[in-house]
Amino acid sequence: MKTYLVGGAVRDSLLNLPVTEQDWVVVGATPEQLLAQGYQQVGKDFPVFLHPVTHEEYALARTERKSGQGYTGFTCYAAPDVTLEEDLLRRDLTINAIARSSEGELFDPYNGQQDIEKRVLRHVSDAFGEDPLRVLRVARFAARFAHLGFTVASETQSLMAAMAKSGELSALTPERVWKETEKALKTQSPQIYFQVLRDCGALAVLFPEIECLFGVPAPEKWHPEIDTGIHTLMTLAMTAQLSPEVDVRFAALCHDLGKGLTPKEFWPHHHGHGPAGVKLVEQLCQRLRVPNPVRDLAKLVAEYHDLIHTVNKLRPETLLKLFDAIDVWRKPERLEQMIMTSEADARGRTGFEENPYPQGDYLRAAFRIANGVSVQEVVASGLQGLAIRDELKRRRQQALAEWKLTQEVISPLN
């Protein structure tokens, strides 16, 4: 019986990245042998065990054979006669198919180290095409390692395109699609995930609301990049520099979905695209079972992001309506989330990446003024019921009106 460190831990150590978890493969052993040593079995479909002390995962070496549809349609064979090479052969990418022995010796039968040096994501074998989840995994690894210069091998790209065309992606459950997407949104370059999916045809299958933005023009004066799909990915890339939050990044991804509904005769203008996009956000989130808090922010950003661009022109009552709509009184964190997505929208344009976004500070200051009106004083004045709400609104409007007189005019987005 021999144990080997495998997968991400070996890959990340070779890339000089922090290793967060370790997975092991055990060659030449039976479940009974591991159980006798105190390991706890946790895998139902294939034999995976938890180490009695470290609680790290140890899996018996196994092979997999396609026996049905989708990413669950596999028959596993785990036995003492399965070799390390056979176990590594079933893995998705060569960079994930390297093992290290307890003595530190590397086993790399599929040239993963060479692909790490070349910064290439390459599938190990044609069995890659049997698991549709791997299309998403490759896109996620491309996003995760883009800053290191990794790209997808052309032959892997071709195989992913064939998989997208075959209809196999429809076997993926919404939960798995969202889980991979959520992981991708947390990476340093989340826009690469969606670009890789688009390059192989998977974006049209899994995210048609985003796919249809490509080829939709916006006015060149405001959008030198012209294409709304390109602008969407630029906005997501900019958001990744401003916030690590999945909610904010997903909202940025969805902010212009409504432009996909604009009839061609109205191009390149998209009047009312914000409210129109709310329904598409709802549709996308319902299909992928996106968590409610993530969905709620994305809907608000779709509806109000353009309003924030013109915040200094808003009347006091309109500012208060905006604060009410985003529920900032009870959820003050929403203010920063809305500002970050609007800033990313403004800066996610060719030639505007380094521009300041004074609308953010203006909106923060406006909220401080409105929130500074004392609710206790209104209640203490003896008013009852709805009269309290109306008086609070009146005082907030008055405070904002007086404050606005002292503010410099912000030039519009240019």
Swiss-Prot record:
It holds the Pfam family PolyA_pol_RNAbd. Its cofactor is Mg(2+); Ni(2+). Magnesium is required for nucleotidyltransferase activity. Nickel for phosphatase activity. Mg(2+) binds at E21, D23. The keyword Iron does not apply. One of its GO terms (molecular function) is ATP binding. Keywords: ATP-binding, Hydrolase, Magnesium, Metal-binding, Multifunctional enzyme, Nickel, Nucleotide-binding, Nucleotidyltransferase, RNA repair, RNA-binding, Transferase, tRNA processing. InterPro entries: CCA_bact, HD/PDEase_dom, HD_domain, NT_sf, PolA_pol_head_dom, PolyA_RNA-bd, tRNA_CCA-adding_enzyme. GO terms for biological process: RNA repair; tRNA 3'-terminal CCA addition. The keyword Transferase applies. This is Multifunctional CCA protein. It comes from Yersinia enterocolitica serotype O:8 / biotype 1B (strain NCTC 13174 / 8081). The gene is cca.
